[in-house]
């Protein structure tokens, strides 16, 4: 990326991004490099498959055009972000030629939660910072963002595969949120056992452990009622607040997708076994 003149930075989840957080300058710089290397670009051409003679067919501004190259590399993307052209419309074209495909699904996406009206109205858009998120033994130290429909952000995307697996297996999945990742249960219990007098439990949590706002709302959401008074029970809840995931956000809102060309449809060189000379690359696999 930096070789293209675009400064990069690594985010908290280990992903690398353009420093300006825009992809278009990176794309323009890459296209210039390709053209400087002799590549000829044909914009506004939409691939339509093959004709009876095996030539590639495109819809172009001047009408249908064909090409019969010695080799073809397909890099057609997944099935999200339709407005930018990534719609997965190529999958039936390959399937018709006998190439194995897998149904598309969302990846690196938001997830649905049946929040109470209180959470939707008061905390939609709020980040839950400095927490540990876990799903079925996989975990990440990060943050998540509450949305009107559920949860999203980098920490959620890191666990998206595990969440999707749980949804496929059980119909729902459970995201556990450790609100106090730097404290163990005994340390939390010691704080909770301090006299609170006439303070409410919410005030006691705020003053003794700094748990307030959206974090406190997640606690109440988990119990859907009165918080437990027993220090050990409450401490364990603080270390593993369960959030019931009921589904994924719509496919077209996903950052990327699973599915596409099946791995067993390709040889070691990523050539389609059913279509010699046709190779696949990128998210379409």
Description of each model-found segment:
Residues 4-16, 38, 98-107:
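A short alpha-helix-loop-beta-strand transition element characteristic
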Residues 40-55:
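A conserved short coil-to-beta-strand element within the FAD-binding core of flavoproteins
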Residues 112-144:
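Acidic, Ser/Thr/Pro-rich intrinsically disordered regulatory segments
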Residues 283:
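Hard-cation-handling environments
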Residues 71-117:
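Glycine-rich loop(s) and the adjacent beta-strand/alpha-helix scaffold that form part
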Residues 3-14, 71-75, 81, 132-278:
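Residue-level recognition of phosphate/Mg2+-coordinating polar/acidic sites
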Residues 13-32, 41-42, 81-86, 112-116, ...:
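Short beta-strand to alpha-helix junction loop
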Residues 40-42, 102, 279:
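General small-molecule cofactor/ligand-binding pocket signal
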